[in-house]
Amino acid sequence: SLEANTGNKLYIQDDLRGKNVDAIKALAAEKKVSISWTPKKTLSDMTGGAVHQGFVLRVSEFAYSELSVIMDKAEQEENPLILILDGLNDPHNFGSILRTADATQVTGVIIPKHRAVGVTPVVAKTSTGAVEHIPIARVTNLSQTLDKLKEAGFWVFGTDMDGTPSHKWNTAGKVALIIGNEGKGISANIKKQVDEMITIPMSGHVQSLNASVAAAVLMYEVYRNRL
């Protein structure tokens, strides 16, 4: 985040010393970010108890992308994959999904404005910086957005217990993949717009995978088929 020019104040643990600290101080000076030496307990309070390693960067409000920017980017790619998160609530899941999305060259991510997690400091940290590299659009109406994607030639896929096994999934062309809410899955009105449901074959005792793990398996399936 410091490299990406999104920070406006850096808090460093007041008893921290070493080469890493010197390097980060130099980068902060280069980026014109002010530094505040802060007690460890205060840093822990600021991060809600999350691991901070002695550094907390206050960032400007996240700059979301326009849907049109993601769709224009998709037009430049041979086999674009757009990820749609339908009502995801856990910031750790969101951050983890973004991290995998960056690794698998996902074109862009679309999330709803309401009843879903947005890009928060926890999301940014869990994504290990991926938020700076993937366009993320926030839309008011997910259903209308799916209509626009279909008009642009995208096939819309969802995840469900009953569907085409992921290893038999035809991922050619323009792919829009919907990942549902952690508990309820894909909402009923959105399900109606799905062209094909995909299921991840499982042989164990549990019935489902964590949302970020399921998303990762399917993103890698698309990525593998492009290699």
Regions inferred by a protein language model and the residue ranges of each:
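N-terminal positively charged helical leader segments and presequences
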Residues: 1-72
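Short beta->alpha connector loops at strand-helix junctions that form conserved
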Residues: 13, 39, 86, 112-113, ...
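Hydrophobic, well-structured mid-protein blocks that either form specific transmembrane helices
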Residues: 80-128
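Amphipathic alpha-helical repeat scaffolds
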Residues: 89-96, 141, 209-214
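Histidine/lysine/aspartate-rich catalytic loop segments that bind and position anionic ligands
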Residues: 107-161
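Short, glycine/polar-rich helix-capping loops at beta-to-alpha or helix-loop-helix junctions
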Residues: 116-122, 184-193
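Structured adenosyl-cofactor binding patch, chiefly the S-adenosyl-L-methionine
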Residues: 125-128, 188-227
